[in-house]
């Protein structure tokens, strides 16, 4: 039998440390993880950051790549970024970059498709929010020096930080969906992975 794999999402701003934490969960704790395919998205990202174009194409690509998962087993899957956080952060920050029709399509995909297609969109059993201050996130982005991210400015990181905070507060205040917030500013990726494993073992 195939079981629906329980999904735990790791959300947070650009530069909060999500990929590194997932890497530690996989290598040190033998967990199944799903990374964002950043290399495949490089050309989309460069078009956005360098030419201020292609926002809708990229969001559609993200949705197709990330909003659905295969049913594989009953093991936990740790997934980088949830559809809900993607919608509430990036799509809302870039709202004026879409035509009204494009925004309406994205809104429909993220908010209606789960009812229409019987909850096919990823629904995490736990949202883990990796909180990081805009300063720390911005410095990490500069340090890792990904080509597509070189033009990112601090204001964007601040805006995205605010949206992530709002999204986390909304999810946790409704009480319907389990959430766990960790600040990554002064912790190593090893410590963060350890905290996540301990929390998940104690709460699932």
Language model: regions and residue ranges:
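A glycine- and Lys/Arg-enriched "phosphate-lid" helix/loop adjacent to the NTP-binding pocket
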Residues: 88-166
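Conserved lysine of the Walker
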Residues: 18
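Conserved substrate/cofactor phosphate-moiety recognition/catalytic segment
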Residues: 27-68, 88-90
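NTP-dependent small-molecule kinase module
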Residues: 138-204
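Hydrophobic anchor at the beta1->P-loop junction of P-loop NTPases
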Residues: 10
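Hydrophobic positions on the alpha1 helix immediately C-terminal to the Walker A/P-loop
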Residues: 21, 25
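P-loop (Walker A) phosphate-binding loop of NTP-binding proteins
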Residues: 13
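Short amphipathic alpha-helices and their capping/turn segments at secondary-structure boundaries
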Residues: 63-77, 112-118
